[in-house]
Design a protein with these regions (language model features):
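Conserved phosphate- and dinucleotide-binding cores of soluble alpha/beta proteins
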Residues: 1-137
Length: 137
């Protein structure tokens, strides 16, 4: 997440970024985490997104994120004012990976996991027994 879209666009035009992002077209395995606004009071979430951005995500009913790409409980992508400042793999490229693996393990991640499953952003889920039991209810 960059300070403004101009920085993001400049980086995206660089040859170094183009070389790296070309690999995204041929991913075999993607191993990434799932974020959740339910953990917004946590130090990491607050440090990364801040209070104002967190409030905006809640207002837009964001269920979770993968690589700062936000989605709702139904799996639909949610555009935010951070979208144009985000420099990360696009969700459609993650969905093309042969194995798209997520390893979330807490009740706080429930809405993010459900949204990711419904959006088909996951084809392999590794979690603990308590989170799995919650998902099966």
């Amino acid at each position: 997440l960059l300070d403004n879209p101009l920085i993001r666009n400049g980086i995206m035009q660089s040859q170094h970024f183009k070389t790296i992002s070309a690999y995204w077209d041929n991913l075999d395995v993607a191993l990434v985490g799932i974020g959740s606004p339910a953990i917004r009071d946590g130090a990491n979430w607050h440090a990364f997104y801040g209070g104002e951005e967190s409030d905006d995500l809640n207002a837009r009913q964001v269920a979770g994120d993968i690589c700062s790409r936000f989605f709702d409980i139904h799996g639909a992508m949610v555009e935010t004012n951070m979208s144009e400042k985000t420099l990360s793999i696009e969700m459609n490229k993650l969905k093309q990976a042969r194995y798209s693996i997520r390893i979330p393990m807490s009740e706080e991640k429930y809405s993010g996991i459900v949204g990711a499953l419904r959006g088909k952003y996951i084809n392999c889920l590794v979690t603990n027994s308590s989170t799995a039991e919650l998902l099966l209810k």
